[in-house]
């Protein structure tokens, strides 16, 4: 899942291409893991990088890396040294649960609680819930008279294309400062052109309704005719 655009890549298909070669499949799972299916072994993922701040529901500060046997062989053959991100050093101390460096203990405690929530619900149920919320959000956006940006959308994030002439930066600022809802805007060449709404983690249907309302109010400030009622009605029907 590419966070800045809301595009979901077909990692399974990529794995089928890479598995018989000497290349490594390295996957950015920072936003996707915990929200959409990601089957490391079945999809032949060699390295999966995950962050704590998205679907794993805690502040940024923790990162996780899974490494395949194929990737370990490549790492072991690399002569160039490194320091903090030395995976070989981390692997050496892992069996003893003796971190190579001082760990962020408060974040680890928070992560344990967040993972308990995921395990209690069941990861397959989490994926299904996020999928339903994401699909319903896209339906709502279209019913409001707006467009989504991604042609291959991820369910954990909906990217809304700003209408012609609308300042997306001002939309984000209004939602945050006036409506009390903090969305994400676009990055680089998409800055001011899109607004991103999450449906991952602990976000529920009521949070999304509040977000849609905030977006509609921000767009109305720029004289955009938005049918919020139709959007919320379509959203609720899509969840039934």
Which ranges hold each PLM region?
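A short linear hydrophobic-aromatic micro-motif
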Residues: 145-148, 181-186
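Conserved PLP-binding catalytic core of the aspartate aminotransferase-like
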Residues: 147-178
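Conserved active-site segment immediately N-terminal to the catalytic lysine
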Residues: 41-53
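Active-site C-terminal subdomain of aminotransferase-like
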Residues: 53-139, 143, 240
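Active-site phosphate-binding strand-loop segment of PLP-dependent enzymes
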Residues: 1-34, 47
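PLP-dependent enzyme catalytic core of the Aspartate aminotransferase-like
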Residues: 189, 193-240
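A common structural junction motif
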Residues: 177-183, 217-219
